[in-house]
């Protein structure tokens, strides 16, 4: 099930409510981690950069998804797929559950959010970025191999791949200051749809592209929400829960 707190239609609204409320607070609450002022200052700088990247990635995910639906390269097939999927709720649920990052347990309720630690949220972001690292590389490779693929789509895929790497570096640096025991090589979900993405059968390949862009968009918006929420927790701690 798509976590109710981070649905594409609601995460932006939640984030705006959350951040607008913070401007009313003059006194910064205690941070959720034990660290020196110097380390907290470094973390703030890292999160400032991370939130910019996550926001850019989220927007690119939305734009690329729209390009697939609007460009003649893929629009006919994509619109047919979405019509078929919406013939039943079961089809939609099955499609979402096929996203390879579903095993990453993002909190589904406000109560779950409150029970989740700062470090656990960090690990979610780390695992999600790692889970997309190789798939994004393959996406760029396969789109580049399609002569009819427009640059408008390919360029978005290339930008997302590059920014995913950059954001991953920032998250790893943040983790090194919060808890070095969290390792980059921890288990994370693996993607197993490369054969479909490389398929010579257009219908199979385009369905793989449809699902790829669908799952990617959801996850990029999730990452953006989580990175901003982590920054809020670092700066304001419990105040961040006040708008949920």
UniProtKB/Swiss-Prot annotation:
Domain of life assignment: Eukaryota
InterPro entries recorded: 4_helix_cytokine-like_core, Somatotropin/Prolactin, Somatotropin_CS
Gene3D superfamilies given in the database record: 1.20.1250.10
UniProt keyword list: Disulfide bond, Hormone, Secreted, Signal
GO MF annotation: an example: hormone activity
Entry annotated with the keyword Disulfide bond: yes
Location of this chain's protein in the cell: Secreted
Disulfide pattern: 99-215, 232-240
GO biological process: blood vessel endothelial cell migration; negative regulation of angiogenesis; negative regulation of blood vessel endothelial cell migration; placenta blood vessel development; placenta development
Residues making up the signal peptide according to the UniProt record: 1-30
Predominant localisation class: secreted
Gene Ontology terms: cellular component: extracellular space
PROSITE patterns per UniProt: SOMATOTROPIN_1 (PS00266), SOMATOTROPIN_2 (PS00338)
Family: Belongs to the somatotropin/prolactin family.
Protein name per the record: Prolactin-7D1
